[in-house]
Amino acid sequence: MDIKEEAIETEGIVKESLPNTMFRVELKNKHIVLAHLSGKMRKHFIKIVPGDKVKVELSPYDLTKGRIVYREK
């Protein structure tokens, strides 16, 4: 088995809330990505609203999509 590729973790600000727990997030480098909530955040009912500062994991294969893994306080 091959070693799983490492995800790129970066910070951003939620700009827009979309249906089905999808969000438009502006990263620190001003790029806009489409991100969904991670499973643990869904399980624990963590709410995300526009303006929240979040940590996003990006796949090294597709840098336009990501997963929100943490919401800053």
UniProtKB/Swiss-Prot annotation:
* InterPro entries attached to this UniProt entry: NA-bd_OB-fold, RNA-binding_domain_S1_IF1, S1_domain, TIF_IF1
GO CC aspect terms? cytosol
Single annotated GO MF: rRNA binding
Give the keywords, sorted.
Answer: Cytoplasm, Initiation factor, Protein biosynthesis, RNA-binding, rRNA-binding
S1-like domain residues: 1-73
Q: Subcellular location, in the record's words? A: Cytoplasm
Q: Is Magnesium included in the keywords of this UniProt record? A: no
Q: Which family does the record claim for this protein? A: Belongs to the IF-1 family.
Chain's role: One of the essential components for the initiation of protein synthesis. Stabilizes the binding of IF-2 and IF-3 on the 30S subunit to which N-formylmethionyl-tRNA(fMet) subsequently binds. Helps modulate mRNA selection, yielding the 30S pre-initiation complex (PIC). Upon addition of the 50S ribosomal subunit IF-1, IF-2 and IF-3 are released leaving the mature 70S translation initiation complex.
UniProt subunit comment? Component of the 30S ribosomal translation pre-initiation complex which assembles on the 30S ribosome in the order IF-2 and IF-3, IF-1 and N-formylmethionyl-tRNA(fMet); mRNA recruitment can occur at any time during PIC assembly.
Please identify the protein, giving its name as recorded.
Translation initiation factor IF-1
Q: Which gene encodes it?
A: infA
